[in-house]
Curated annotation (Swiss-Prot):
Annotated gene: rpsA
The protein's name in its UniProt record: Small ribosomal subunit protein bS1
Superkingdom per UniProt: Bacteria
Pfam family, any one: S1
One GO CC annotation: ribonucleoprotein complex
UniProt KW keywords: Nucleotidyltransferase, Ribonucleoprotein, Ribosomal protein, RNA-binding, Transferase
Low complexity biased stretches: 437-460
Domain notes for this protein: Full-length S1 protein and the C-terminal domain (residues 285-479) bind tmRNA, the interaction is not disrupted by POA. Unlike M.tuberculosis (strain H37Rv) the S1 motif 4 does not bind POA, which may explain why M.smegmatis is resistant to the antibiotic PZA, the precursor to POA.
Amino acid sequence: MPSPSVTSPQVAVNDIGSAEDFLAAIDKTIKYFNDGDIVEGTIVKVDRDEVLLDIGYKTEGVIPSRELSIKHDVDPNEVVSVGDEVEALVLTKEDKEGRLILSKKRAQYERAWGTIEELKEKDEAVKGTVIEVVKGGLILDIGLRGFLPASLVEMRRVRDLQPYIGKEIEAKIIELDKNRNNVVLSRRAWLEQTQSEVRSEFLNQLQKGAIRKGVVSSIVNFGAFVDLGGVDGLVHVSELSWKHIDHPSEVVQVGDEVTVEVLDVDMDRERVSLSLKATQEDPWRHFARTHAIGQIVPGKVTKLVPFGAFVRVEEGIEGLVHISELSERHVEVPDQVVQVGDDAMVKVIDIDLERRRISLSLKQANEDYTEEFDPSKYGMADSYDEQGNYIFPEGFDPETNEWLEGFDKQREEWEARYAEAERRHKMHTAQMEKFAAAEAEAANAPVSNGSSRSEESSGGTLASDAQLAALREKLAGNA
């Protein structure tokens, strides 16, 4: 049985209507653009001179390489790749060759202007990448070319701008003129605003009396500025040292790491007052802690006054030797006994921490002199327990008269103190010889040796106790 025949449907030309209807149907499938329109498309070809973009037009759109990026002389392959979806602005609907000419950078420019105008309105920062160094500053890619003057790159003028190439930075928009295609930026303004915010937060957390570490950032005649971590505080020259100084550079240098105490935080003026000397022991307290009344100490005469002589016994510490404490004989004026610049062994007879005064005596120091060396008089104060037994240095065995192993540091410290005490005794001996000659000349008569005027030390010292004297000799032998 023959199969039935299948016939194809017949379509008449007039099934789609008139010729006008046919052209209208074709027209609906074609996209139309005007100059200035922004279109979307897919990259279909990348050449050195141009890029082809499929935007659904009767022909591909052409993006000349110079219209790909705001950067100059770029390789198209570094900007786009086949398959990329991009936006472009219509420059010319049809050039001499009938091509649709597009610009990627102009589309980016138009989009960016809207964003930048909005940021400028809100006084917010814009973020961009440094793409070029030009005369007078930098060019940033912020969707368009933004100019950042060299004077506004940092808080201080930057000489070499090359290291900024490729860096992403934030800046405030200070000038904006679309008609002139002009965008001027300021990173310094952004830094000032940011640092001000950080500074306020930091100052709110900073407490009076707090101890902080910092780095000396600059030195001026009236003090030194210390960077505490983004916020600078001032150490006034009077707070740099316990001793008198003429210039801050005598104490610190730029770059020095220092420990300071916060004296005051002025929130209204955003100023921080610091002190370096407050973190260091008061030399007066140090002297009181390391010296006892009755000790004989070395000093240097610094000033003569009608009522006596001032003697410096430590850096920043001066005491008064009253005129009545200069000599056993009657003294009319201090220079009959001492001169400025003289070295003198003096006895500490009073320490007034509250008034920051030390009373000294040259006369009593000489009266206490003995030819036999007594370390306790010259800084090696003896220690005794409640039963009156001498407390030996840590690490020293009185039974064997030997230092124990593992106490090398204690031994070195003891021997150093012993050597210093011995040195002071020798200085005192020299002073006695000098003063004996001076007294003899002044009185025009010989005087007895200073040692005859002194009594033997009382018991309980390394010099007077037989057992402890043996220890002294042993320790002195190891010094």
